[in-house]
Amino acid sequence: MEKSIFMPLLLALGLSLAGLSVSAQNHSKSVYGELLGASQMIGVNYDARFNRAVPYGLGWRTGLGFGYAYSSSSAVALSFADGEMPVAYNRMFRFAVPLEINYLLGKGKSKFESGAGAIVCLDRFTSETGGAPEHSFGAIPYLSLGYRLVTDNGFLLRAGAVPLLSFSPFRVSFYPYLGFGWAF
């Protein structure tokens, strides 16, 4: 009889202690998926604070994103983040690496996030009519403004806007973003 009570109590105690250790973490690091924003269309990112003892303040972010643009007419130039697709092509594939310095303001679960960085891009332009693809490599400067929620158990929600900057010709394109992940 004692063994049948002892094991469930030991299991309950272990689960309680594990739950306390998760909620006691400072959540200064996070991994999350992102739609749009600096990931361009879809991506996965890692974010951390320079001061690992606190879940707010100055930090950095990097990741890997993927973007795609298509036009049914090769005579129409597509606008995609930092410029226009060459007229002879009607599809663009983009691999993107966002690099950002950011700041989280707030000490509770809800924080305001702001940042500045560059998206390092490798673009591949293709056409349905054939021909050799064209490649380009570059960087797009951007800002980031948004809201970040981190629950006690580590669930992370991010939402905001990323103004992308282009300099030839000068223009600002706004991309919303939505992210879900885990803070630890």
Predicted feature descriptions by range:
Residues 1-27:
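Bacterial Sec-dependent N-terminal signal peptides
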Residues 37-55:
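N-terminal targeting signals for Sec/Tat export/insertion, comprising classic cleavable signal peptides
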Residues 50-57, 66-184:
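Outer-membrane beta-barrel transmembrane domain signature
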Residues 26-35:
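Transmembrane beta-strand segments of Gram-negative outer membrane beta-barrel proteins
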